[in-house]
Amino acid sequence: MKLRGKKIVVLVADGFEDLEYWVTVMRLREEGAEVISVGPGEGPFHGKNYLEARADATANDVDAGELDGIVIPGGWAPDKLRRYEEVTDLVAAVHERDKTVGIICHGGLVAISAGIVNGVSATGSLGIKDDLVNAGATWVDKPAFRENDLVWGRVVPDIPDFCRELVAALSEG
């Protein structure tokens, strides 16, 4: 169990990408991590494909200094989550502490609003390529990769690669 003792937030809101959320949560738990689902309220939140998830806490309830990482799954949820300053502040605070930030698919929208993509390489859903580039990122069309504390994943079929990179980064941090 590579992540025993690690505390990791996974963001959730209505419209989350079911597999990007649930596979990542299960993979982190499988490695022994304490996973805290954070959303704008308790939920239940409904995924794009109708799976449900509940939040354990809101962003205001979580101390970035106690976290080893944060994950931003895709779907439509990132467009909602980026509107909550407490969410973008939490993402920025985790990044400022050089802790792992995992971003897949449309999760880059939250990273943009958190101000953490300028000058970095990034990937995600092709639908947000222009957003990432306009925010100062360099687009990289790869399934998943790591750059410093940022772990990027493209889309649903790339979840295995994303989770592999994410677990590796979290186990080193």
Outline where the language-model segments fall.
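Extended, subdomain-level signal for the structured scaffold at the beginning of enzyme domains
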Residues: 1-97, 101, 110-121, 129-173
